[in-house]
Regions:
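Structural and coupling elements of P-loop NTPases
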Residues: 1-599
Length: 599
């Protein structure tokens, strides 16, 4: 099909605003799928995606549509993940498009995630088609949404298309708007092969399947291709398009969105954002926008049953083949045995990996407290990247520690603004901007350390706003902070599973809370056990577990007080000796209880 009859577009939306439902309706309207194949959330292939109602991997699909002008067009839809953890995948998918449908729930209005993803689309200079979804709901307020479009997003209200994806209202208007407003792809004059990899999946039988958008030239079976960043060459074994199943084609031409298979063994060989070109007639420069994906959040993952270590390693390797952003390396802990230090794009990514380990591989795992990457400058000028408390040097040789910051967009009902501002300040953040979205809602912009939003920020924000708040974030660099390494000592012995890097001002309250939790789960010993939180050599919080009392005078009949005193003195000496040489054996389930209650 000629390039002028091709349209590439994406759908961006906040979670639950109906993005995947709209995709389903478009597939039905264009008769891409038959009635027999119909099922809700068709493009969300993973059970986890259907269950959580989110899109985790990109899902492209080619549709053919006969427009009112009498021409048949090929519409390539790239269904992208909506969550910030996958923003690089979203950016690469958007770069493969010329237009984007911006979905807004007419009952909810503009949400925090809408803003973040719209910024990504505008960075790529895409044509934006606003769609007001769910107009059939009693709570829908179309006029208010149109006002928000103009006030917050600076998009003309008359451009908005009212629709209901669930009931099929406005679907034809959306298809016509794609053809009229989204420009056709433009091919480079030299017609050399340039294609961008925007995703890849691993197939057990065929190896890596790379998803590509062809910008110029063509890809066909038997062709020798080269990838810019690995500089490796491959022979194309198969290429085709998604309908939504993989359908073989003789070639992919400029403007096409499709896939190719070329004997790649892992997702690391087909990096997202890499440029594909012909090995004999390569293009002179790569397509812009490529960057290495860096994990932002780290956590130790250990098997609950230590004999599952090899099975866990195999499971992680299989997940990594499909997910190049997930990293892991072996580590061991005296408390938890052998496990892995894992890197994730963010909290949702971490949750998804853990859930997939449990579901797809039946692995029972425990994860340590999540940490972030710190930049450390030593007094001798040496720069370090620290993602594990054990790697942090002694305080005496540290010149400066810098922590990662995030820009938070929080959309809340105006009544709760005071509570949320207090929460941001409690988390060491600064509110940089407030904007009234409509008479009832406010958009807060704040800068907060990434480590502070890792665990409970979203949950607390949701409960404070009775579930009406929404948030999204983007990374915004590093800033200096007074971070310290806090160790937990149990009977004088440091336990590395509980070591953490915390802010100096929060160390005492965190240490005290952890000591209390440990006191509740560690069984009593025959001697007094001290649980201490310490920074360097200074103890900042302490709890004690009293000794079990054994009645050594029980066998003394009669009233000989000197005999009883002798036995009690002997017991006292024995306890002191035990305290000096005794080791506290902490059962593994105690660690698991503490780590899980700390989630």
């Amino acid at each position: 099909m000629a390039t002028e009859f091709t349209r590439n577009f994406s759908i961006i939306a906040h979670i639950d605003h109906g993005k995947t439902t709209l995709s389903d309706r478009l597939l039905e309207e264009t008769q891409t799928i038959s009635q027999r194949e119909k099922q809700d959330q068709l493009l969300d292939a993973m059970d986890l995606e259907r269950e959580k109602g989110i899109t985790i991997k990109s899902h492209p699909v080619a549709m053919e549509y006969k427009a009112k002008d009498g021409n048949t067009y090929r519409l390539n839809l790239l269904d992208t993940p909506g969550h910030v953890d996958f923003s690089y995948e979203v950016a690469r998918s958007l770069a493969a498009c010329e237009g984007a449908i911006l979905m807004i729930d007419a009952a909810q209005g503009v949400e925090a995630q809408t803003m973040a993803n719209l910024h990504l689309a505008m960075d790529q200079k895409l044509v934006i088609i606003p769609v007001l979804n769910k107009i059939d709901l009693p709570a829908a307020d179309v006029d208010r949404c149109k006002q928000q479009l103009e006030d917050i997003l600076a998009i003309p209200a008359e451009d908005a298309i009212p629709a209901s994806a669930k009931n099929g209202i406005g679907i034809e208007d959306i298809l016509e708007a794609i053809i009229e407003r989204v420009p056709a792809p433009v091919e480079h004059e030299d017609k050399l092969l340039r294609a961008s990899v925007f995703d890849s999946v691993y197939d057990t039988f065929r190896g890596v399947v790379s998803y590509v958008r062809v910008f110029s030239g063509s890809i066909h079976k038997g062709q020798r291709i080269r990838l810019f960043h690995t500089n490796k060459t491959y022979e194309v074994k198969e290429c085709g398009v998604f309908t939504p199943k993989m359908t073989k084609r003789d070639e992919l031409i400029a403007g096409d969105v499709g896939y190719f298979i070329a004997n790649m063994k892992s997702a690391d060989e087909a990096k997202i954002g890499d440029t594909v070109t012909d090995s004999t007639h390569p293009c002179p420069e790569e397509l812009p926008g490529y960057k290495e994906i860096q994990p932002m959040v780290f956590s130790g993952i250990y098997p609950v049953d230590t004999s599952d270590y090899e099975a866990l390693k195999t499971a992680m390797a299989k997940l990594q083949i499909n997910d190049a952003a997930f990293t892991f390396q072996s580590e061991s802990s005296t408390a938890l045995g052998f496990g892995f230090r894992c890197g994730f794009l963010g909290l949702l990514h971490m949750e998804i990996i853990q859930e997939r380990l449990r579901r797809e591989f039946n692995m029972d795992v425990i994860s340590t407290y999540p940490s972030v990457i710190y930049q450390v400058t030593k007094t001798n000028g040496e720069e370090l990247i620290v993602d594990n408390p054990a790697m942090l040097p002694d305080a005496q040789v540290i010149e400066e520690i810098r922590e990662p910051m995030v820009k938070l967009f929080i959309m809340i009902p105006g009544d709760y603004i005071g509570d949320i501002m207090a929460l941001v300040m409690e988390k060491r953040g600064d509110v940089t901007h407030t904007e009234t979205v409509d008479p009832t809602r406010v958009l807060l912009t704040a800068e907060v350390p990434l480590s502070e939003i890792l665990v409970d920020f979203n949950d607390r924000m949701k409960s404070m706003t009775r579930g009406y708040g929404s948030m999204d974030y983007e990374h915004c660099g590093y800033r200096p902070a007074k971070m310290v390494k806090m160790d937990m000592l149990i009977a004088g012995e440091p336990v590395e599973a509980f070591s953490t890097i915390v802010h100096r001002e929060k160390a005492e309250s965190y240490g005290r809370a952890l000591a209390v939790r440990l006191k509740d789960v560690i069984p009593q010993q025959l001697f007094v056990v001290a649980i201490q939180a310490c920074i360097g050599g200074n103890i900042i919080a302490s709890e004690r577990i009293s000794a079990m009392r054994k009645n050594v005078t029980a066998k003394c009949y009669g009233g000989d007080i000197s005999r009883k005193r002798k036995l009690l003195e002997k017991q006292k000496k024995g306890k002191e000796k035990m305290k000096a040489f005794g080791k506290v054996n902490i059962p593994q389930d105690a660690f698991i209880k503490v780590l899980k209650s700390g989630d």
